[in-house]
């Protein structure tokens, strides 16, 4: 085989690895879990980092804060800087980082709607407000096909199911492509196949959990919710993609790729 043909074959067979970051909702993130995921990112140096949204909570400008003392707390700057620091630490050793829009990050725009004269200010557009371009991160305002046949979404684009993986799978059926998402705070994968005989296709719905500390979520009654902490690791060769879900324990520890992070 000619060397040029061998090189092309090797290029086609190169494994690309993704680290998928679930909902952080800074400042309500699980600090130990996030530190351990950063250790994983630095050790493995993934080719790409995918962020499913809700990286920052924006709790002081939520509709729930209106008319309460929370609306007067001046914490957005600190929350933003902490979010940027965490995202940088998670992606600094990767060639690319993609971030998808989400309902919590939409809170900035929804707040600007109350003062329409400010909407056109470029520095108040969410990607600029967060400085993503300066950090080499790409922001997507709509669902993004990051791999042939696979869409990155937040997960609020359709109806939400209480069963892990089904929210993503319903989006996959709607779009005709497999879906990777967050939003539900659940960790799971579900699949659906359709066709006749040897002519069929399989669709997958993958939900990647969350990286929140539920003790900080004061709105949860008794701190109870059908949530699971986790992240995902993806490996691709050519058009083939294999997802691996990584459950994270309540103390923030987990095992991934043969190593314990604790």
Question: How should each PLM-predicted stretch be described?
Answer:
Residues 129-149:
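Short acidic low-complexity segments
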Residues 17, 43-44, 244, 248-260:
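Polar, enzyme-active/binding microenvironments
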Residues 6-31, 185:
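Mobile, glycine- and charge-enriched loop segments
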Residues 18-20, 50-52, 152-154, 180-181:
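Structural motif
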Residues 21-133:
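Core catalytic region of metal-dependent phosphoesterases/phosphodiesterases
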Residues 149-246, 252:
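Conserved beta-sheet core of the metallophosphoesterase superfamily
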Residues 7-12, 141-148, 191-193:
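Short acidic-hydrophobic surface loop/beta-edge motif
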Residues 98-104, 139-142, 244-249:
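Acidic carboxylate-rich catalytic motifs and surrounding loops in phosphoryl-/glycosyl-chemistry enzymes
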